[in-house]
Amino acid sequence: MHQRALLFSALVGAVRAQQAGTLTEEVHPPLTWQKCTADGSCTEQSGSVVIDSNWRWLHSTNGSTNCYTGNTWDESLCPDNEACAANCALDGADYESTYGITTSGDALTLTFVTGENVGSRVYLMAEDDESYQTFDLVGNEFTFDVDVSNLPCGLNGALYFTSMDADGGVSKYPANKAGAKYGTGYCDSQCPRDLKFINGMANVEGWTPSDNDKNAGVGGHGSCCPELDIWEANSISSAFTPHPCDDLGQTMCSGDDCGGTYSETRYAGTCDPDGCDFNAYRMGNTSYYGPDKIVDTNSVMTVVTQFIGDGGSLSEIKRLYVQNGKVIANAQSNVDGVTGNSITSDFCTAQKTAFGDQDIFSKHGGLSGMGDAMSAMVLILSIWDDHNSSMMWLDSTYPEDADASEPGVARGTCEHGVGDPETVESQHPGATVTFSKIKFGPIGSTYSSNSTA
């Protein structure tokens, strides 16, 4: 009787699970990267990338009927979260023709618009091709080349880490049968509520279709975790930003208690949605980054980020660039009361004061809390536009109605309106970002140069 009960329980669990489809074979585009040692020798690693489950075709398990079309759910297949998870399956992806994602050796190119698809988000897979590659960052550095020359105002070619589960949530949430192979388990410091599935269950209950994004909406739950933005950038502006959370791993939140971009009360949640950012333009150094500037976005650049600390305790995040064989130190702050060119606890406190921003960063653990979360982080690469604020927080003046002469308001040279999603999707569908030559290792091991600028 006990064995029969266990069997029945297992069958019920499978029926209610988030399913993986079989109509399209899932083949991850290969992407190599390098792991380096203290002496500067680097070994090639055979990885691949997988697209996030939110972009995938979601259809009935017993056929090919869409469970989700545009930004609405099929009510018969998805009357509630549990039934939807049982009735619907994520399927394999055609990376190039559907999503504009291509790889070649160590290079990954993401195209902004391909057919009806807008933007993409991919994760680096481990060599087993079943789990995400993870990185222990404190005491190490992470380096990559990037070409942002074809990323205009309003777009963001991002490279960042979050504390996603390496298996996509399969072991924590048995209802998730798709796992990392199908790009499940996303979370970040905005506690995003636009995810179709969280913790193996659908997010249909309370779903409200977006009024300005034909492909998205907001559900009743969000998925939270610490986020380390190494690179949020286009050809005009760039920023790197740590975002700590109260919990070190992925957690689910409900409604506006999630906070972040998707909720009425931005600071209601357990994560810091603002972070402590370093944007050279915002820090008053307006001639540093951009076309024909010190870091020239007309050309490929090498981006080096160092995580200073030991024993898991993070004390500083440093940035430098290599371009045309020369190492370029990060821009110095030109803001009164804020000194330095790296992210430290003192820098963050001084910056919040100078800009008149709420110090939500310290409330959720600050730099120390960020360091606590920086083991086994998952690498994410994406291209996207911003239906909330048109990327003005990155490359324009923000808030939109603020005086651009006030400290911290000007973040770049883009005019208001040019980054509107409708504008960039119609005028710049062929925009691209290319990431290549990813390297990871002890500090000083991943880059070299002929001279220092």
Swiss-Prot record:
It comes from the Eukaryota. Residues 402-428 are annotated as: Disordered. Its main location: secreted. It catalyses: Hydrolysis of (1->4)-beta-D-glucosidic linkages in cellulose and cellotetraose, releasing cellobiose from the non-reducing ends of the chains. Glycans are attached at residues 62, 285, 388, 450. One of its GO terms (cellular component) is extracellular region. Residues 1-17 form the signal peptide. GO terms for molecular function: cellulose 1,4-beta-cellobiosidase activity. The keyword Secreted applies. Its EC number is 3.2.1.91. GO terms for biological process: cellulose catabolic process. It is found in: Secreted. The active site is at residues 227, 232. Keywords: Carbohydrate metabolism, Cellulose degradation, Glycoprotein, Glycosidase, Hydrolase, Polysaccharide degradation, Secreted, Signal. The keyword ATP-binding does not apply. Belongs to the glycosyl hydrolase 7 (cellulase C) family. PANTHER family: 1,4-BETA-D-GLUCAN CELLOBIOHYDROLASE A-RELATED, 1,4-BETA-D-GLUCAN CELLOBIOHYDROLASE B. The biological conversion of cellulose to glucose generally requires three types of hydrolytic enzymes: (1) Endoglucanases which cut internal beta-1,4-glucosidic bonds; (2) Exocellobiohydrolases that cut the disaccharide cellobiose from the non-reducing end of the cellulose polymer chain; (3) Beta-1,4-glucosidases which hydrolyze the cellobiose and other short cello-oligosaccharides to glucose. This is Probable 1,4-beta-D-glucan cellobiohydrolase A. It comes from Aspergillus terreus (strain NIH 2624 / FGSC A1156).
